[in-house]
């Protein structure tokens, strides 16, 4: 089994903020597959099982995401872990993939690294930098950014669908990496 985790913060206060990119992308995927999440108190997360994937949205707040991830990883004895998360160091419109490496200051990844190691796959969604890191990641996308954000989230969702069918991270990486911001028609 593979654990597929979307990072974000719970509660309406943080809904659709830049830091909740992982939640939003997983929500879109689950909706398109006509599935739904159910809350698991055991893992303090919303879970959805599809094929041999466990889709997880931790409800611990970002800085403690590793607690939910470790709990689900151990319970389901998953072999692979893929984290979908926002990335300040990438411009909006860019999607990159990697295995392992540093956390880039991302507190959700720090928590996962501490409790689970850093040897996992990542789908990184660029959210650009702003003035004041905390304020920026907890802000919603500007109206003029919405079309690009929507297109990029759709692209990331399609990458996950491909991965679920192929189980091939390298093929997903080769097919769906966006090194430059996605170009959309106005």
Swiss-Prot record:
EC number: 3.1.1.29
Chemical reaction(s) catalysed: an N-acyl-L-alpha-aminoacyl-tRNA + H2O = an N-acyl-L-amino acid + a tRNA + H(+)
One Pfam family per UniProt: Pept_tRNA_hydro
Name of this chain's protein: Peptidyl-tRNA hydrolase
One GO cellular component, as annotated: cytoplasm
Quaternary structure and partners: Monomer.
Keyword terms of this UniProt record: Cytoplasm, Hydrolase, RNA-binding, tRNA-binding
Ranges in coiled-coil conformation: none
Site residues, Discriminates between blocked and unblocked aminoacyl-tRNA: 9
EC category: hydrolase
CDD domains per the UniProt record, alphabetical: PTH
Positions with a binding annotation for tRNA: 14, 61, 63, 107
Protein purpose: Hydrolyzes ribosome-free peptidyl-tRNAs (with 1 or more amino acids incorporated), which drop off the ribosome during protein synthesis, or as a result of ribosome stalling.
GO molecular function list: peptidyl-tRNA hydrolase activity; tRNA binding
């Amino acid at each position: 089994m593979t654990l597929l985790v979307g990072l974000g913060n719970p509660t309406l206060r943080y809904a659709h903020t830049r830091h909740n990119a992982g939640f939003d992308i997983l929500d879109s995927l689950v909706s398109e597959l006509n599935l739904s999440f159910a809350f698991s108190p055991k893992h303090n997360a919303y879970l959805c099982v599809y094929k041999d994937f466990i889709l997880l949205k931790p409800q611990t707040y970002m800085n403690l995401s590793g607690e939910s991830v470790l709990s689900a990883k151990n319970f389901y004895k998953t072999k692979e872990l893929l984290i979908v998360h926002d990335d300040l160091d990438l411009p909006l419109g860019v999607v990159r993939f990697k295995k392992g490496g540093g956390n880039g200051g991302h507190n959700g990844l720090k928590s996962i690294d501490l409790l689970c190691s850093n040897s996992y796959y990542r789908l990184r969604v660029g959210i650009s930098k702003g003035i004041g890191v905390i304020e920026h990641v907890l802000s919603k996308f500007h109206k003029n950014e919405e079309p690009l954000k929507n297109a990029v989230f759709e692209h990331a969702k399609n990458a996950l669908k491909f991965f679920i069918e192929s189980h091939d991270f390298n093929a997903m990486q080769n097919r769906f990496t966006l090194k430059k911001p996605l170009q959309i028609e106005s």
